[in-house]
């Protein structure tokens, strides 16, 4: 995931 695109961590 990325800096502001990580819903699960």
Swiss-Prot record:
Supply the source organism's classification. Eukaryota, Metazoa, Chordata, Craniata, Vertebrata
Query: By its UniProt entry, which PROSITE patterns does this protein fall under?
Result: NEUROHYPOPHYS_HORM
Query: Which InterPro entries has this protein been placed in?
Result: Neurohypophysial_hormone_CS (IPR022423)
Q: Member of which family?
A: Belongs to the vasopressin/oxytocin family.
- Keyword terms: Amidation, Disulfide bond, Hormone, Secreted
Task: State its role.
Answer: Antidiuretic hormone.
Cysteine pairings via disulfide bonds: 1-6
Sequence positions bearing Glycine amide: 9
Q: Which GO terms describe its molecular function?
A: neurohypophyseal hormone activity
Its protein name is Glumitocin
Location in or out of the cell: Secreted
Q: Which organism is it from?
A: Raja clavata (Thornback ray)
Extract one GO cellular component term from the record: extracellular region
């Amino acid at each position: 995931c990325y800096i502001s695109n990580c819903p699960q961590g």
